[in-house]
Amino acid sequence: MPFPLVKQDPTSKAFTEASERSTGTQILDVVKAPIGLFGDDAKHEFVTRQEQAVSVVSWAVAAGLIGELIGYRGARSGRKAILANIPFLA
């Protein structure tokens, strides 16, 4: 099996050891951290401040890239409109 089984206490939903958690679950924790989906159970999760910082930066970079793509697309159409008015550059 590529991922170890995750043993969880049904009463507290706390994991006994960080090493028992699957990689997929750890990735989901890092993705959920900046969204605030941990709430009161944050003390039971094995997500460090460094992982949260990496996740916040990742979300910021992704949002920036999406904004750049939208802006670039708009700028390209604007540039084409400007260049269309100059015959020797079109």
Curated annotation (Swiss-Prot):
Q: List the disulfide bonds.
A: none
Q: Tell me where on the tree of life, at the top rank, the source sits.
A: Viruses
Tell me what topology the record assigns in the membrane: Single-pass membrane protein
Can you tell me where the transmembrane regions are?
Answer: 53-70
Instruction: State the compartments where it is located.
Output: Virion membrane
Name the keywords, alphabetized: Membrane, Transmembrane, Transmembrane helix, Viral envelope protein, Virion
Instruction: Give me the Gene Ontology terms describing cellular component.
Output: host cell membrane; membrane; viral envelope; virion membrane
Annotated signal sequence is none
Disulfide bond found in the keyword field = no
Function of the protein: Essential for membrane formation.
Q: What's the protein called, per UniProt?
A: Major envelope protein
**Organism expressing this protein natively:** Pseudomonas phage phi6
Q: What is the lineage of its organism?
A: Viruses, Riboviria, Orthornavirae, Duplornaviricota, Vidaverviricetes
